[in-house]
Design a protein with these regions (language model features):
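Hot-dog-fold acyl-thioester-processing enzymes
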Residues: 1-53, 100-102, 109-189
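Acidic/His-leaning functional-site neighborhoods
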Residues: 148, 154-236
């Protein structure tokens, strides 16, 4: 089952160039995933578990402009053990494909946080589609940079917290953007990027964002107070 929804590219969805930003794109993905879930009886208002994001990989071919409408398609591609794969396709008003993305998720008990094993019933519920735009449904782990050029500290404020009572996945991309050197940011947002989530962050915690550059792009690692990795963001050149 391919779930389809239209989105309006509003002012708050755009960067300085008045095209869709990466953070807005992730919010579109987050919303259509929850819409699909609600459509098949998997609404967080009705079930005793939550879907938690493990990783994203996005490839933007072209960015839609402000005041346009886009069509987003999403489907469950595969289920294995405790992990599920969801893919996305974004189309412009002319029907041209302008972005592909893949994501991996786990399902946890809403009260205990314990991982739940996923079976064929989940694949049937979501009407899994085997097709995909990526070779594998499973996103490989990122390698941490050996040296960091910049480090900044941030507090987890209330506006970072979502319905799962921890820092929302999109906020990690916001923090990664904030730690990028101005010269890097001025070149424009990366059209190919990956995010891996390692551990939840909570209100009142202090996080350290570490930026490092390499031959293929830049990496930002978000760490907790004990130096434990919370998330990794890789921007390709």
């Amino acid at each position: 089952m391919v779930y389809t929804e239209q989105f309006y590219v509003g002012y708050s969805d755009c960067g300085a160039d008045m095209t869709l930003s990466n953070t807005a794109l992730l919010r579109y993905f987050e919303n259509i995933a929850s819409m699909h879930g609600a459509a098949v009886g998997d609404s967080p208002l009705e079930v005793p578990y939550r879907w938690v994001l493990l990783s994203y990989h996005e490839c933007v071919l072209r960015r839609p402009k402000f005041n346009s409408r886009v069509t987003l398609k999403s489907w469950n591609r595969a289920v294995k053990g405790v992990t599920s794969c969801r893919e996305f396709e974004l189309y412009d008003e002319g029907g041209d494909l302008i972005c592909t993305a893949i994501s991996n998720w786990v399902r946890v008990d809403a009260e205990t946080g314990k991982l739940q094993r996923l079976g064929e019933a989940v694949a049937e519920q979501y009407g899994s589609e085997a097709r995909g735009n990526f070779d594998s449904p499973w996103i490989p782990k990122l390698k941490e940079a050996a040296v960091y050029d910049v480090e900044k500290r941030y507090m987890v404020e209330r506006n970072f917290i979502d319905a799962n009572r921890h820092m929302n996945n999109v906020c990690y991309l916001d923090l990664a953007n904030c730690v990028l050197p101005q010269a890097v940011w001025d070149k424009g947002e990366s059209n190919t990027f990956s995010i891996h989530y390692r551990k939840a962050s909570y209100y009142g915690e202090e996080l350290t964002c570490c930026y490092g550059s390499g031959e293929t792009g830049a990496t930002v690692v978000v760490k907790g107070g004990e130096g434990d990795v919370r998330a990794e963001v890789a921007f390709e050149r």
